[in-house]
Amino acid sequence: MNNNTYWYEFRQNNSGGSFVVDDKVCHRIYIEAEDFREAVIIAERLGCYWNGVKKGIDCPCCGDRWSKWDKDPIDLEKYNTEGMNAEVYDGVYPDTKAEWNKKYGHYEIIERPKFVNDYGRAYKGRIKIKNIEEYAQFMADSYGWTVPDARIYYKDGTVKEVFSKRSD
């Protein structure tokens, strides 16, 4: 990102029980643009569409495949200073701490992880996210629904694919 561009995130819902993955779209796409309007135009060129249920394209019970719900750019400065929660729920993996370290141990740690009981027992800490690549990797490792899990579209035309490092 330069001083005149921002990062926008578009997420795909698995409408009809599956995700669309091709050479342009996957679960999440990140677009560098001067404003939200430009990001939407780029997303549409890549194959994103809006109001799919209303148009009869998407499953009415699952909902629209794509949405433009978040017009604000990704706040990388906030995630670089305040960090993001990084958690692994206990009982999902054979070794919860090892799984947390596999997913998040390579990030700069702001708050060391510990077991907490919020919405179930989780091993939770805070990590620093320094750039769009780290943000996309964090989201891929947290959700990891498709292969690739994300694509980053840079303003200069460069495209980077991001793959989950999850073990499940």
Role assignments for model-derived ranges:
Residues 22-34, 120-130:
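A short, exposed loop/beta-hairpin motif centered on an aromatic-Gly-Thr core
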Residues 20-22, 41-43, 164:
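Generic alpha-helix signal with a bias toward terminal, lower-confidence helices
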Residues 1-4, 31-42:
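A short, structured loop/turn motif at beta-sheet edges
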Residues 1-26, 109-111, 117:
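Short aromatic-glycine-(Arg/Gly/Cys) micro-motifs in beta-strand/loop hairpins
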Residues 15-17, 36-38, 134:
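Generic "edge-of-domain/loop-turn" microfeature
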Residues 45-168:
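Short, mixed-charge low-complexity intrinsically disordered segments
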